[in-house]
Amino acid sequence: MRKTILPIAFAAALAVSFTVSPVEKADSKKAITHTIVNNSSAAASTTVATAEATALSIYERLELDKLGLSVDAMKYAYKGYEQLREKGALANSDVLTVVDFSQSSRKKRMYIIDLKNDKVLFNTYVAHGKNSGLDYANQFSNTPESLQSSLGFYVTKGTYSGKHGLSLRLSGQEKGWNDNAEERAVVVHGANYIGDHRVSSAYMGRSFGCPAVPQEYAEKVINLLKDGTCLFIYHPSSRYEQESTLLNG
C-alpha cells in the first residue's frame, strides 16, 4: 500500500490547532463565569429597585405624605423589612411599623401599616429617649444606661406586665446599633407623659430609651405589633445608612 506523507507545514498547523483549542475553551469558561457574576449583581440591583418601587407605591396609595411620614423612612423601612422577611425572621410579615424620628415629638410619628390589606392600622405619638434630645431626637445609642433611643430594625416578641402595665419586648436586629435592646429593657409600653394633652408643650415627655406610646392606646398598639412583626426606627443618619447590614444587604 502506498503511504501518504503529510507535508511538514500541514502537520505543524494541525499541532497548533490542537494546542489552541483547550485555551479557547478555558477562555469560554471565564466568559461564562463573568456572565454569572454580572447577572448576580444585576439581580441584586433589580431586587433593590423592586423594593424601592414597592415602598413608593405603598407610600402613594396610602397617602402617607399627608400623615407626615418621610418618604425615605418608608423606603428604608420596606427594604429592611424585605431582608428580614426573606431570612424568615418575621413570624408575622403582614404588619410593618415605622417610627419617624425626623419629626417633632409633638407629631404622630408612629405608623402601623397593614401590608396585606393595604391600609394604615394606626398612627400615634411615640416618645424618644430623654438623652436623645428635647423636641427632636438627634442623639442615638446602643449603650446601656445611655437613656437614648436606638435606630434600626427590631422584631417584636411577646408581652409581659411590668411597672408600665402591658409591655412588648423588642429584639434589636442590628449589631452595634440596637442589639442591646433586651439588655437595656427597651420595650414598647404606655406612658402618661405623651399624648394629645402634651401637644401645646415645648416637647412631649421622654422615656429612658423606649418607644413609649400614649397610655390610652398602649394595649391597642401592643396587640397590633406583638409576636414577630417588624418595627423600624428611622432618623436621617448617613452613618446608619452606610453601616446598616439590612439596608446594605
Regions picked out by a protein language model, each given a short descriptive name:
Residues 1-32:
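Bacterial Sec-dependent N-terminal signal peptides
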Residues 29-207, 215-224, 229, 240-249:
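Cell wall/extracellular polymer interaction/catalysis modules
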